[in-house]
């Protein structure tokens, strides 16, 4: 899912800029294949629901609760 989101934004740098994080933070999400829930919510809002937070978090939901 994170790869689709990055493609939508055009680059890791642009995604990071939109979220107010570093590109290295985004790179870590790619490496871990996990996005923190609060960032997933932010992505859902920024993309007007194009990507749903619940789908971004996926099977890791219980881990974050």
Regions found by a protein language model. Name each.
Residues 3-4, 8, 13, 17, ...:
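Short, charged recognition helix plus adjacent turn
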Residues 33:
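The DNA-recognition helices of helix-turn-helix-type DNA-binding domains
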């Amino acid at each position: 899912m994170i790869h689709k989101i990055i493609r939508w934004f055009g680059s890791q740098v642009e995604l990071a800029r939109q979220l107010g994080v570093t590109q290295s933070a985004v790179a870590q999400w790619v490496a871990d294949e996990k996005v923190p829930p609060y960032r997933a919510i932010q992505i859902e809002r920024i993309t007007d629901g194009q990507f749903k937070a619940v789908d971004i978090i996926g099977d890791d939901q219980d881990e974050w609760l």
